[in-house]
Amino acid sequence: MKSIRYIASCCLTLALATTALAQEIRSNAEDSFITKPNGSREVDFGATIHLDSKGYPMLESLETIYDEMDYQGAVSAYLQAMPQMNLFGSLKTAHYYGATGNTDSLVMHNDPSVDGMLTPNRVVTYLMNYANLAESGPMVFEQPAGATAGLIMDMQMRWHADTGLTSPYQGKRVVKYLVLTVDQELPDGINKNKHEYVIVRIRTNQVWYVFRNLDPVKNPDLEKETNIYPYSERKEPKPNQFFQAKKSDKTYFMAQPIGMAYWKRLHEYIQIERVNEADRYMMARLKAVGIEKGKDFNPTPRQIKILKKAALVGEKMAITLSFAARSQSAAYRDDSNWVHPLTLDPSHEDGPIYQLEQRVDWTFEAYGNSLVMQAGIPGEGSTYLAAYRDAKGRWFDGEKEYVFHIAPNAPAARFWDLSVYRMETRGLLPF
């Protein structure tokens, strides 16, 4: 017991000595680093924090500081979860229209589902599938030959493969993609040398398989030549089901929900997904506001207050990043208000950092990501330009009319399209 007391005493003495030393060092530093704590010193964290004469927070201020910590952590988590909530909303759309099974696909073309998509166009037909590999085991996706362009991505919208015309196979033949999670074993009997399958490993439980039928007038049912099945059923795969919204159906909006609904959906997503290494700090932040893996979401009144404020501020930050990006690579021309909305690397990495702002910028309003979506050369893929303000720099206003000037000989090998979207949903405006 004596030794314990002695150690504690030494630690206390060391702490006091360190404080005194810091005071001495600071007093000899440049003016910008001088700190003279006193009882009247205040820090604005949205609320005033009083410090005592030693520079410590007053005891009655501790809860206010923790409130601010949890609020800032929730805002950070809100932004970090943007692509997950994007694709989880897309999955919810598929389920809403009936495509709930691992081999079910949602077909979207000239129907109410298209109006609820994030920034689509009305030219192509979309096919989407969300298989849960934790349930099904490794899955096979047979991409049909023909004029399609698609992607295989994980639920954080990280690229894993291009399919169709923009793949190395250029849509000339059926290609079998064998998709596994990073920890699933390669099935017995796979001979990599025979190239029967393109092997794709993803870092989430669910995979997003999507492609566009680029010429639905010429080949209206090309997407239904897709074949999806668990590898374990490859010898006798079951027929796929293709679902499409009826003209009389309501529109399901896949955009990220707002307010507390955002956090409820994020909690739901976390329960069925694995935690990636890069997510662990976010998970710690979420735990402080009542969102944990394996536990129900029952936030306290204090946590609800923090979450509501964080959702409001997080959404405004996302709008700012998406509609007024500060990334230099977003600029199209110095004399134009048009921008490149997609500046996110397919890996979400840029040297030593993750591209947080570029990730929020793109995934708040759109989905899909690949180098071929940033091609810049006709015939090599696609390129996207966006405008949020008029020629005088004013935000677009739905109550006003605008004239869109198109230069002759638009550089497009297959087609170009102009679409107009609502700010609230990032969905198409009705005709």
Regions flagged by a language model, labelled:
Residues S9-T19:
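Bacterial N-terminal signal peptides
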Residues Q23-F431:
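A compositional/structural signature for long, glycine/proline-rich flexible linkers
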Residues M1, A17-Q23, Y209:
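Generic low-polarity alpha-helical segments
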Residues M1-C10:
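Bacterial N-terminal signal peptides that target proteins for export
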